[in-house]
A protein has these predicted regions:
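Accessory nucleic-acid engagement/destabilization modules that flank
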Residues: 5-6, 10-20, 26-225
């Protein structure tokens, strides 16, 4: 059947051009977005506000690793067979001149968000802060970013991550993602660790004057060195 064929052939696609129906492989799309995002992050110079000498670090102060990680995980959920069935059917309809459905009804952003949120739990409260930040970016990368909490004090992100109906095929998606991209979970963990350090600098960058001094004094309470 179609699902077995997609798995066997690794025929995962991200999208296609409507003028000539050329498909773009999902792994190609992810790598291109990751590369562009990393390049954008590399241009963010946090040293303009934060003194690296004060932070006892000689590392480059950019968001390169953070945005690289977000780019890598943003379409994690498109490895869902549900999404692949939809996009392959849309490609067929386009070739046959049939009107597009336009909306898949599949929440592909939640998959990568769940992955990074779960991973962040291994790194204590500070890792969780960064994990929740990145999970929001990944989960809502098509827009609609909500407040951190609603009027009832609930987190829209956590409610979305805990909705099992959205993630019934999560394990299958994770296996397909790592197999197709030929990367390891250890590689993602290394990116995450570097992201934690970058976000630490970003937090300090947002502080000025006496507020910045207080932030630096209490830095150990927020981010580990």
């Amino acid at each position: 059947n179609e699902e077995k064929r997609i798995h066997k052939m690794n025929d995962y696609i991200a999208r296609f051009r409507v003028n000539d129906f050329e498909k773009q492989e999902l792994k190609e799309h992810i790598r291109e977005v990751q590369k562009l995002a990393a390049a954008m992050g590399k241009r963010v110079d946090l040293r303009r506000t934060v003194s690296l000498k004060e932070l006892h670090s000689d590392k480059k102060a950019t968001l390169e690793n953070t945005l690289s990680l977000v780019g890598l995980l943003h379409d994690f959920g498109k490895y869902s067979i549900k999404f692949q069935r939809f996009i392959h059917e849309e490609w067929r309809r386009a070739k046959e001149g049939i009107e597009s459905k336009r909306q898949s009804g599949i929440d592909h952003g939640v998959y990568g968000a769940k992955y990074i949120y779960d991973l962040s739990g291994k790194y204590g409260p500070n890792g969780r802060i960064v994990g929740e930040l990145l999970a929001n970016v990944i989960c809502y990368h098509h827009g609609g970013l909500p407040d951190a909490e609603d009027f009832n004090g609930d987190s829209p992100l956590l409610m979305r991550l805990q909705d099992e109906n959205r993630l019934t095929d999560y394990e299958q998606v994770k296996v397909a993602f790592f197999k197709d991209l030929q990367i390891t979970e250890q590689e993602i963990e290394q990116l995450f660790k570097k992201s934690v350090e970058e976000i630490k600098l970003l937090i300090l960058k947002s502080s000025t004057g006496s507020e910045a001094k207080n932030k630096r004094k209490n830095d150990a309470n927020f981010m580990p060195n």
